[in-house]
Design a protein with these regions (language model features):
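Beta-strand-rich domains and repeat architectures in extracellular enzymes and scaffolds
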Residues: 33-66, 285, 289-292, 299-300, ...
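Beta-propeller domains
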Residues: 57-75, 79, 310
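Blade-loop segments of beta-propeller domains
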Residues: 74-95, 103, 129
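Short coil/turn segments at the loop-to-beta-strand junctions that recur within blades
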Residues: 82-87, 125-130, 202-209, 326-332, ...
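Asp-box/WD-like beta-propeller blade repeats and closely related beta-sheet repeat scaffolds
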Residues: 116-136, 144-150, 155-177, 190-213, ...
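Periplasmic c-type cytochrome electron-transfer domains
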Residues: 118, 215, 221-228, 232, ...
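Short, conserved, GDST-rich strand-edge loop motifs in beta-rich repeat architectures
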Residues: 144-172, 225-304, 345-373
């Protein structure tokens, strides 16, 4: 194996190679893949030094900060520094200090450029840090994170304002955090392993993403990420039966429902549709929750959604000074006008209150091609002015139909991300991630909504590679530097000619299959009819949009499920005896194996961790389709999504099987992040442990306990774990792929549970027949409109665990003695549910000359977890929880070490150098020899520590 190290000095590019000492690498590394794909969304991936001489770029898959000298006018490689896992944002504080947020590591790397560039400090922050800015007098560092993560409640920062319990089960909690540090002294208190924030600020929206600073540096703007759009689901139990739209009914609690589901009551072939809930949207004009027919559903909604999206903070006092609502559904980036301070927010606005995919022939309407409008919202003088970037699109004309304008896509921009504004305040540049282009707008026309995309598109800048994610404007050189994620490169654009004049490709450890398949998730130019829609319109960076959609297709036909059904042998007898407990036929037809093309609302599921989860969709209906039928084949199920490119995304044709396989090769490789609620040592709290004991115990929580019936019909009673199977060796994290009948109008597939923690924030649900818990009553403002169950209508896990099928009984259900205590314990356990990766994955610490006492125990923890056995099918089976990597400056470069958990020492590649644990730690006693540790994914340690010949990823300067 060889390692290539590139050094730029005085404009001269030098290369050299060194041999890898194989035997030491093999003994120290865990089994597992050399690379794990996470698909983290870049936020601020490129930055320029204050003096304008150095360009910085994050190498997200490589875990590096890359630096380029701009002295010659073209970026020339200067050095690279290993940071954490999945770096997504970079900011230069001075010419000699750069900060990097590492999304998967829950950390911020402070990189010194003095002497040998290296990490001098690692700040430990909340879950998934995304953006970073500097503002205020004295200067402060502001970092966005989710309102969770192990460090948030670490005893070392217990005295920090805002730190502590994230209150995951408490209503009305702000869930967007900003960690504030003194960058000149990030350790304002002694005894912390990862810095001491001045405060943790929280804002009333869900997990944040972007930050921006006013021109005077005194105001910081904070934006939520997936902030919603004032939509929520009315549960099926609150909707009148029978699809009667004008006939109200009285509900069990004595309140009135305005009628039934808007229908149609059948598909185009006359097959009766299953009863389902419906999506309602708050009408700010008349202050009512309304459906598509304008009917009022206030009696069936128990929360309010203020939809505050962006917040202004005094950078000096850290007090919130303003908030802005209805900015967008998914907010990506922000920028301020350097002349007048106008704030610009790139975003998409979802139309999930419109039902159905397909041509819309039978129902008369469709959401095809009109999923989420690409926008920039202009905020000025307290007013929020959304501007649709693609207002030229006629959404009523579907691709392939008469009158459709096939040229419209050439004027469209998809998934707008980073923005930069000229120093005179007149021109805005926006990175269009799904369009391989940079949009260019006159700011006056943008504010006045007078721009015409058909003519303005002549000024758009095409960029090779695709996945345009970040921008740096270099007016002194007349250049724009553009990060393109698809090919992991930086492009140079001549602003005068609007032509690409140079490109620098960053080393990429991703498998070629990942690189080749990624565009199919995002590329709206190739894979949609109008150039705006893509799979990522809903699956944001391959994850969720935190919304529900009703994507049935009345123009499709009923199909048959091949998936085994828990209680499946019992269901026909219940149907025959009219004992299902339902007020309407199961699945619409009273056939447990029917997939009706109409299904009602379902929340967007993550595309991460699909590989071992069986058939896809909430019902598992992609188990059968275009390319075949299989109950458990995840790959085939993914291929069967091909028609959605036509019926939903809105392309004129669907991809070929070969194209879908390319897509599958990428998407099925993506794994979820480690659980941010579970303890870093993979232990459980007493409550979580009690919940696990019941979950994995023998007591049936659901079904009928009757030996005679079971002998005739097979298993009729199931424990939690027998439905939501946890078997890491098989890749099962809450599902083994079966369906289940649970006393609701449709048979659904049992879902995985790895990301339950990411769905909290909705509190407030009325009484419904399926749930034994009482009406929550009005809970007031909340940050999310969708929670649990397939349709998102159940606010909390605790309420779901009060479902009538889990009712306490003598032989099944929750224990009759203190059932709510056990339900609370199970809720806590599910929020900390096992995942493909151990909680320690990505965690870091930097040992310095002053923090050995505080940071030493964390180093020991990392070493212990690197020796701890772990099982994960996604990682190849039996592995250790992590590979522990360490970096330290030695001589004129940075040396990487890999921990050998058997010998207890650290191995360096060059010359088979070995250092004892104590010897490596002792190096940090010398300023400038700080030692940074990283818990890498099992199997990736040699690549990260020593480099990768396959991709020429070096580790040294």
């Amino acid at each position: 194996m060889k390692r290539f190290i590139i050094i730029a000095a005085a404009g001269l590019l030098l290369c050299w190679a060194a041999g890898l000492f194989r035997s030491k690498t093999v003994s120290a590394a865990s089994n597992g893949p050399s690379f794990v794909e996470f698909e983290s969304g870049q936020v601020r991936p490129v930055a320029i030094s204050p003096d304008g001489n150095t360009l910085f770029a994050v190498n997200t898959p490589g875990g590096m900060l890359e630096a380029f000298n701009l002295g010659s006018g073209t970026p020339v490689f200067q050095f690279r520094v290993p940071v954490g896992l999945e770096p997504v944002a970079v900011a230069a504080r001075t010419n000699s200090e750069v900060w990097v947020t590492n999304l998967l590591s829950d950390s911020v790397s402070i990189v010194s450029l003095s002497g040998t560039p290296h990490v001098t400090r690692t700040l430990l922050v909340g879950d998934e840090p995304r953006d970073i800015v500097f503002a205020g007098t004295p200067q402060r560092a502001f970092i966005t994170t989710a309102h969770r993560g192990q460090q948030r409640s670490d005893p070392s920062i217990a005295g920090v304002p805002g730190a502590g319990d994230p209150k995951l089960t408490t209503p009305g909690i702000p869930r967007a955090d900003v960690w504030v540090f003194d960058p000149a002294n990030p350790d304002t208190a002694t005894g912390t392993p990862g810095g001491t924030p001045l405060a943790i600020l929280s804002f009333f929206t869900d997990t944040p993403r972007a930050l921006a600073v006013s021109p005077d540096g005194n105001t910081v703007y904070v934006a939520g990420f997936k902030t919603g759009n004032q939509t929520t689901t009315v549960a099926q139990g609150r909707v009148c039966v029978g699809f009667q739209t004008t006939t109200p009914c009285t509900l069990a609690d004595g309140t009135a429902s305005p009628g039934g589901n808007p229908g149609p009551a059948t598909d185009h072939a006359g097959e009766p549709a299953p009863e389902a809930g419906l999506i309602v949207k708050f009408n700010n004009g008349d202050s009512h929750w309304e459906d598509e027919l304008g009917r009022v559903w206030d009696n069936s909604v128990r929360l309010t959604l203020p939809d505050t999206d962006v917040f202004a903070v005094n950078a000096n006092t850290l007090a919130q000074t303003a908030s802005y609502a209805h900015v967008g559904t998914t907010l990506f980036n922000m920028a301020t006008n350097p002349k007048d301070g106008t704030l610009y927010v790139s975003n998409t606005d979802a139309v999930n209150n419109v039902r159905f995919e397909g041509p819309g022939t039978f129902a008369g309407h469709t959401v095809q091609g009109h999923l989420a409008e690409a926008r920039i919202s202009v905020i000025s003088g307290g007013a929020v002015m959304p501007r649709h970037l693609n207002k030229h699109i006629n959404y009523t004309q579907l691709a392939g139909s008469a009158g459709f304008d096939a040229t419209a896509k050439s004027h469209s921009l998809s998934m707008p991300l980073d923005m930069k504004i000229s120093s005179d305040g007149t021109t805005l540049y926006v990175a269009a991630f799904g369009s391989a282009a940079v949009g260019v707008f006159n700011t006056t026309e943008l504010a006045g909504d007078t721009f015409n995309p058909v003519t303005e598109s002549a000024n758009y800048i095409p960029v090779s590679g695709g996945g345009v994610s970040g921008l740096v404007l270099d007016e002194a050189r007349g250049q724009l530097y553009v990060m393109t994620r698809f090919d992991n490169a930086v492009k140079v654009i001549n602003l005068k000619s609007k032509q690409q004049v140079a490109a620098v490709t960053l080393p990429n450890p991703e498998p070629e299959a990942v690189v080749q398949g990624r565009p199919m998730l995002y590329d709206a130019t190739t894979f949609s009819g109008n150039g705006e829609a893509s799979c990522a319109s809903c699956h944001i960076f391959g994850d969720m949009d935190d919304l529900a959609w009703d994507l049935g297709n009345p123009d499709n036909n009923v199909t048959t499920s091949p998936i085994p059904i828990n209680l499946g042998n019992l269901v026909p007898f219940l149907i025959a005896a009219n004992a299902t407990g339902l007020s309407s036929p199961l699945n619409g037809s009273n056939s447990a194996t029917d997939f009706h093309p109409m299904k009602g609302p379902f929340t967007t599921q993550t595309l991460r961790g699909l590989k071992n989860s069986g058939a896809m969709h909430w019902r598992g209906d992609r188990s059968t389709g275009q390319f075949g039928t299989s109950a458990f084949d995840s790959n085939l199920s993914f291929l069967n999504f091909a028609p959605a490119f036509q019926t939903l995304v809105g392309n004129a044709t669907m991809p070929t099987q070969a194209q879908m396989q390319t897509f599958a090769n990428f998407q099925l490789a993506v794994v979820p992040p480690p659980n941010p609620v579970r303890n870093l040592d993979n232990s459980l709290t007493p409550s979580q442990g009690n919940g696990q004991a019941f979950f994995a115990g023998p007591r049936p929580s659901d079904g009928l306990v009757n030996p005679l019936v079971s002998s005739l019909l097979g298993q009729t009673a199931f424990s939690c774990n027998q439905c939501h199977v946890l078997n890491p060796a098989a890749g099962a994290f809450g599902t083994a792929g079966n369906q289940s009948f649970e006393g609701v109008p449709q048979v659904v597939k049992i879902p995985q549970l790895r990301n339950a923690y990411a769905k909290i924030g909705m509190f407030g649900t009325p009484a419904i027949p399926f749930i034994g818990a009482p009406d929550s009553g009005n809970t007031g403002p909340q940050v999310r409109g969708f929670g649990f169950m397939g349709d998102g209508s159940i606010d909390t896990l605790f309420r779901f665990l009060n479902a009538t099928v889990f009712a306490p009984g003598a032989q099944s259900g929750f224990p009759q003695n203190n059932p709510q205590g056990t339900q609370r314990d199970v809720e806590q356990y599910v929020l900390a549910f096992d995942s493909d990766l151990a909680p320690i994955t990505g965690q870091q610490v930097t040992l310095t000359s002053t923090n050995a006492k505080a940071a030493g125990p964390r180093v020991t923890l990392l070493e212990q977890r690197a020796a701890a056995p772990f099982v994960s099918k996604a990682l190849g089976g039996a592995v250790k929880e992590c590979d522990l990597v360490a970096w330290v400056v030695q001589g004129r470069g940075v040396t990487g070490y890999l921990f050998d958990p058997v010998a207890g020492d650290f191995v360096a590649e060059r010359g088979a150098v070995k250092l004892s644990d104590a010897s490596l730690r002792a190096l940090a006693a010398t300023p400038g020899q700080e030692v940074t540790f990283l818990a890498a994914t099992p199997g990736s340690g040699p690549r990260i520590a020593f480099g990768d010949t396959a991709t020429s990823v070096p580790r040294l300067r």
